[in-house]
């Protein structure tokens, strides 16, 4: 009989103790654990606290957008003075007597909410005798024929990227809240437009990532029109960018980090091994593999001895990480213990077990990469930051199932910006509304308090 709170596999007493220690180490890699600053101890010690295509299908009826006839605000804009062509700059433009009008539907945000606005921009057309063409006022031309303003489009993008709403749901929300009819293709167009406007933000994030002392990297599968492709993530814990490739080959990844002189933190996928910079491999990945094999082979004495020896090595190391942080002066002393572990269990010990040999080869291959964090300040020993950055993409993958390639590229750019805002505890929506292109320069506005603490001592 199996109980819900009982392990599904049996193991020895030593194995149970080792599983418990490894579970504690894996838990210590989580963000919540690092915030709470729990210390690692062995079991006998106390634990202390310290998308669709753009446009309709062929054969479907076409629709013409009806522009609102009543505007809540009318803005007069200046006419163009000089011809936009460089060779005609000296040519004065003559008024044609015709009016240029453009209506924008937008959202106005305040501290307590938002409301729909309809603004009509009115100006005069001018004519260039050399170009033989008419020109509208610059303030009207910058709208590029768009009916919806920046804040409206940014709000729709926020619903899709941050809240993961399907296009059909966003269409319904817009209809119910703002009484505006927008098609799913219209939402896709919003995504394209906003992604294009914030291309500079992504480029700036990549530049800052490459200037950081360490980079977290990871990859995951994605379905593009039913074909399996891969999404790559790069992050320094503050900025995030994504890239899409057709295969798992790391060519594009190596091009991105070409010339990087910091430390690359990754899992054990072979594509990362060709990086020319220093590397730190993810310990939780290795510990999970050891834990899984220990469950599968509970009575494998030689493997159990190997795992126990490793446990005795890493527990004091991670205990010092929790106590002192990732400081070289406190961790460098463990290098001698690492050398002793390799001498006794890797280099000077021949074991017939294929399972143990597999891990011996793995430890030998990644000897330097496993312990880089002991010799440098501030280098994380896990890759959970990259996994945290890419998890949003994994959830969206379950919801959407498949993406179109071009739509996926725009989505990933916006997701990188959203995750960068999240890592900096900033609102993705309010960043888009601000018009700022540098996430680091954007400052969150203080929000009004919605609650206050109850003082029980005063009887409140």
Where are these regions (language model features)?
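Short, flexible loop/hinge motifs at secondary-structure junctions
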Residues: 1-144, 188, 217, 223
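RNase H-like nuclease fold core
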Residues: 3, 31-34, 46, 53-59, ...
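Acidic/histidine-rich catalytic cores and adjacent linkers
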Residues: 7-9, 28, 269-271, 305-460
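Mobile genetic element proteins and their domesticated derivatives, centered on retroelements
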Residues: 25, 83-86, 128, 156, ...
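Short conserved beta-strand segments at catalytic cores or DNA/RNA-binding microdomains
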Residues: 127, 158-166, 226-240, 283-286, ...
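Short, amphipathic alpha-helical "recognition" segments used to contact nucleic acids or chromatin
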Residues: 149-163, 322
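DNA-recognition alpha helix
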Residues: 168-179
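Conserved beta-strand -> loop -> alpha-helix junction used to position metal-binding or nucleic-acid-contacting
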Residues: 268-269, 273-309
């Amino acid at each position: 009989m199996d109980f819900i709170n009982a392990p599904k596999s049996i193991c020895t007493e030593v194995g149970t103790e080792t599983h418990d220690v490894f579970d504690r180490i894996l838990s210590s890699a989580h963000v919540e654990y690092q915030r709470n600053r729990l210390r690692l101890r062995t079991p006998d010690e106390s634990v202390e606290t310290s998308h669709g295509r753009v446009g309709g299908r062929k054969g479907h009826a076409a629709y013409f957008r009806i522009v609102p006839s009543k505007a809540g605000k009318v803005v007069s804009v200046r006419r163009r003075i000089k011809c936009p062509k460089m060779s005609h700059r000296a040519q004065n433009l003559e008024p044609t007597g015709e009016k240029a009008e453009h209506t924008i539907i937008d959202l106005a945000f305040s501290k307590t909410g938002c409301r729909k606005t309809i603004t009509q921009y009115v100006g005069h057309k001018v004519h260039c005798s050399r170009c033989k063409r008419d020109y509208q006022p610059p303030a009207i031309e910058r709208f590029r024929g768009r009916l919806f303003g920046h804040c409206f489009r940014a709000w729709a993008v926020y619903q899709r990227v941050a809240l993961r709403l399907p296009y059909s749901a966003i269409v319904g929300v817009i209809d119910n809240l703002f009484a505006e009819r927008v098609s799913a293709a219209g939402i896709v167009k919003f995504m394209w437009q906003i992604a294009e406007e914030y291309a500079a933000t992504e480029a700036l994030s990549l530049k800052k990532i490459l200037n950081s002392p360490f980079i977290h990297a990871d990859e995951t599968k994605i379905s593009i029109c039913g074909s399996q492709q891969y999404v790559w993530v790069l992050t320094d814990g503050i900025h995030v960018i994504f890239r899409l490739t057709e295969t798992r080959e790391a060519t594009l990844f190596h091009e991105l980090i070409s010339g990087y002189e910091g430390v690359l933190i990754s899992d054990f996928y072979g594509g990362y091994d060709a990086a020319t910079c220093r590397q730190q491999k993810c310990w939780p990945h290795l510990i999970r593999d050891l834990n899984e094999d220990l469950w599968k082979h509970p009575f494998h004495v030689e493997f159990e001895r190997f795992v126990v020896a490793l446990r005795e090595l890493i527990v004091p190391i991670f205990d010092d990480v929790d106590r002192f942080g990732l400081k070289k002066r406190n961790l460098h002393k463990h290098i001698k213990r690492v050398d002793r572990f390799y001498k006794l269990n890797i280099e000077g010990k021949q074991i017939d077990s294929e399972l143990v040999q597999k891990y011996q080869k793995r430890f030998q291959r990644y000897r330097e990469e496993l312990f880089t964090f002991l010799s440098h300040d501030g280098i994380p020993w896990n890759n959970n930051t990259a996994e945290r950055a890419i998890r949003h993409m994994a959830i969206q993958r379950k919801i959407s199932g498949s993406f179109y390639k071009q739509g996926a590229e725009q989505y990933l750019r916006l997701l990188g910006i959203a995750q960068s805002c999240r890592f900096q505890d900033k609102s993705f929506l309010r960043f888009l509304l601000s018009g700022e292109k540098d996430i680091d320069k954007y400052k969150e506005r203080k929000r009004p308090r919605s609650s206050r603490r109850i003082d029980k001592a005063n009887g409140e």
